[in-house]
Amino acid sequence: MEEKPNYVIQVEEELPTLLRKATTEEMVGFDNYKENGHPFPHSISRFHPSHASTTTLNGQETSRSIDTMEAHHHNYNETTPWTHQRKPSISMPTSPNVLMISDPTTSLSSENHKNSGSTGKSVKFLSQPMTKVSSLYIESGNGDDDRRQSHDNHHHHLHRQHQSGHHQNQNQAANKLKDNRYNSFKTWSGKLERQFTRKPASVEPEAPNRNNQNLNTNEAMPVDRYYDALEGPELETLRPQEEIVLPNDKKWPFLLRYPISTFGMCLGVSSQAIMWKTLATAEPTKFLHVPLWINQGLWFISVALILTIATIYLLKIILFFEAVRREYYHPIRINFFFAPFISLLFLALGVPPSIITDLPHFLWYLLMFPFICLELKIYGQWMSGGQRRLSRVANPTNHLSVVGNFVGALLGASMGLREGPIFFYAVGMAHYLVLFVTLYQRLPTNETLPKDLHPVFFLFVAAPSVASMAWAKVTGSFDYGSKVCYFIAIFLYFSLAVRINFFRGIKFSLSWWAYTFPMTGAAIATIRYATVVKSTMTQIMCVVLCAIATLVVFALLVTTIIHAFVLRDLFPNDLAIAISNRPRPKQNSQHRWLDQLRNVSSENIENYLKFTDSDSSQSNDVEACNGKTQESDSS
């Protein structure tokens, strides 16, 4: 049999009129390539009518295209010498569906009808990538075909790499948007973020999160959970067996790490403004010649500090309300909600005389309104006998909820008010006495009382020192009532100050700033006492206590700067707000005795069964039965 030359077999549908016209006119550059006046066989347009074969439904095919291809190939072989053997190249369709033969007249009749009525305008068509191959053809190729095919494959490979990289970047962005680990603490859940994506989000079932199952934002966190999950004098350390609902392997958003105890800085700085104002204006300290510009500088710093901290915490309330709510139910943190309002009272007391001398009366009522709201809530819980009764939640930070009454009474009496300051003084003194006795008793239920000394104990000094000055303003003289409160404060102050190893081995936190204003309050009360009792001893006490208070505040300022800018651990993850509502399930201890009963005799097992009805733990029963068995064996 004579060997047939390489040819192209092509199954095509009937072409539209426009393409048929373009190929018959042999437009330059339109699907053809000529060199030395001879068209290459492989580059002859497969859209040419002479090459297109029509397949009928009966499977009959015209041979005009085959004859034409043979003629072109024969002429080209006579004129062009071949220097190498050509390798056949086969292009297969992308799917077997394209091999289905259909009637081209019925499928393209409407298209031909539309094209027949088109105008004669020249239209430039740009080639587009084809997603499917509509025909099966076998064509022969030479070295140019191989190079062209490898070039196309290279571009196709680069295109796929670009698409895969683009899809990978889109997936990373989508995963970042779908990160819902903090949504349980957000005021808005974050599900609306899907509306800002460029492509519509597919409805996918959310994977169950074990942490979210332990987080119920509709219920208040019971106080027992804080005691069970946290430890330490400030209940900020997570117990080893507990888990948190937020990731602990990375830093949380800044607002989640921003505690309410940050307002303690406002208490320390604003109380210093009052102390330096008293040093500059009081009679016993005239010999120091303290200028008033120190008071002015500290007062403006206090205003800027309060505005900054309050603005940041307001953002936390707006964006992460669940975190604020957990701080409010925290048995320690709830007392720091008095700190911003006490700081405002300190600003009113320490305002420089050059700015204003007489404050309006309505300002006092405005500042004391938050105290009424918080005290009705907290004092009611102390008295109700529930899980937040005072004998259960008593800790030294409760002095912050009491000292505000005395500071308010001091400010009101300084402004010329009478009944209001007496009211708050009476309420504060009643609850201070109850709190003082409860803390001194150290009941077994007071789990938050530190075993060793801690800066939190300085809050014992705050209430009596401020109460002595408030009563002196209410009565108009530093009489016996004021002196009793002052002497209590001084005794507590010295009983704590004689401990030289007070701060050794204690981790620094921002709440330490709240423990500095009691020292400042004791120094100011000493100046008031020296005004009545004039002596060299009282003047020395004024200078020493004021110097200690200033040095402590300066030391805390340096420590805060180091932790903020050098160590960068001023705001660690606030584990106190991330505990779960439900305790961690305890490991099943029913199988602890299996290891002890594997290699024992039947007598030991019978002896163990005698103890199964007792109320003691199983491990102790096993040890007891084993011990008795060993004793009987030895005897």
UniProtKB/Swiss-Prot annotation:
Its main location: membrane. Residues 153-165 have a biased composition (Basic residues). Residues 1-253, 321-335, 380-396, 441-455, 499-504, 563-635 are cytoplasmic. It is found in: Cell membrane. Keywords: Cell membrane, Ion transport, Membrane, Phosphoprotein, Transmembrane, Transmembrane helix, Transport. One of its GO terms (molecular function) is voltage-gated monoatomic anion channel activity. It is a multi-pass membrane protein. Gene3D superfamilies: Voltage-dependent anion channel. Induction: By drought stress in guard cells. Slow, weak voltage-dependent S-type anion efflux channel involved in maintenance of anion homeostasis. Binds to the highly selective inward-rectifying potassium channel KAT1 and inhibits its activity. Functions as an essential negative regulator of inward potassium channels in guard cells. Essential for the efficient stomatal closure and opening in guard cells. This is S-type anion channel SLAH3. It comes from Arabidopsis thaliana. The gene is SLAH3.
